[in-house]
Amino acid sequence: MKKVRKAIIPAAGLGTRFLPATKAMPKEMLPIVDKPTIQYIIEEAVEAGIEDIIIVTGKSKRAIEDHFDYSPELERNLEEKGKTELLEKVKKASNLADIHYIRQKEPKGLGHAVWCARNFIGDEPFAVLLGDDIVQAETPGLRQLMDEYEKTLSSIIGVQQVPEEETHRYGIIDPLTSEGRRYQVKNFVEKPPKGTAPSNLAILGRYVFTPEIFMYLEEQQVGAGGEIQLTDAIQKLNEIQRVFAYDFEGKRYDVGEKLGFITTTLEFAMQDKELRDQLVPFMEGLLNKEEI
């Protein structure tokens, strides 16, 4: 059995929801407290046991490469000033994993971004992690999916329940049977119109695939939104081999839109005791202001 050693992180999107902030800075580099969002994703992959990561980038994404590269001048400056704690944080970002980069030359959708990394993956099972979803869990969300892959030797799609009124925002599974938290799936539906979703189990940014998925991504079939959708390829893969969904444990934070990004930042800040002690009285004072 081949183990899951490699992961793809698509990071080529334009980040239009965060304009003008993302005009020159990648959305993936927007910080949650003191770390860019993409670092949380990579840390989860590493904790799950991933050895090699390929980040699929686009134009104006050089800052991602710089962040995970070595910075001798900065490290020397911090060392000379005795800022050891900051130095360790900087070194950690540079030593997380073997990280590689490939460019998606045209914004053709998530399925196309994954397809761009096919030569890096080869004939191996692999993971995909989306940068809009940060997961906090006792066992990393991706590790839970990798464990299920080792039991089934099948592709595993990470899902969680979402409110019914939000199902139109996600890929949704139509479950056939279930065993514990694992579902055999009849259909995968990309962003169903309101009121038509077959369930409220939404695909939430964590996947483990067999390499056969590339056969269907190779077809470059245009789907919803005029893009090459990963969900469409998953549906086709499910016709020739079992594809399971797994309701992974943990709290998922949606940092792909402004409100979710702000609330995640606040919640993560509150998890830091020093920041919490300062934030609580500030927020209480803010909420008590009559003009708000």
From Swiss-Prot:
Enzyme Commission numbers on file: 2.7.7.9
Class of the enzyme per the UniProt entry, highest EC level: transferase
InterPro entries: GalU_uridylyltTrfase_bac/arc, NTP_transferase_dom, Nucleotide-diphossugar_trans
UniProt pathway: Glycolipid metabolism; diglucosyl-diacylglycerol biosynthesis
Phenotype on disruption: Under aerobic growth condition, deletion mutants display morphological defects and the cells are curled and show some bulges. No aberrant morphology is observed for the deletion mutants under anaerobic growth conditions.
One of the record's GO cellular component terms: membrane raft
Induction trigger: By heat shock, salt stress, oxidative stress, glucose limitation and oxygen limitation. Expressed under control of the sigma-B transcription factor.
GO MF term list: UTP:glucose-1-phosphate uridylyltransferase activity
Pfam family, one: NTP_transferase
Subcellular location: Cell membrane; Membrane raft
Catalytic activity entry: alpha-D-glucose 1-phosphate + UTP + H(+) = UDP-alpha-D-glucose + diphosphate
Membrane topology: Peripheral membrane protein
Role, per record: Catalyzes the formation of UDP-glucose from glucose-1-phosphate and UTP. This is an intermediate step in the biosynthesis of diglucosyl-diacylglycerol (Glc2-DAG), i.e. the predominant glycolipid found in B.subtilis membrane, which is also used as a membrane anchor for lipoteichoic acid (LTA). Has a role in the biosynthesis of all phosphate-containing envelope polymers, since UDP-glucose serves as a glucosyl donor not only for the biosynthesis of LTA but also for wall teichoic acids (WTAs). Is required for biofilm formation.
Subunit annotation: Interacts with FloT.
Protein name, per record: UTP--glucose-1-phosphate uridylyltransferase
Source species taxonomy: Bacteria, Bacillati, Bacillota, Bacilli, Bacillales
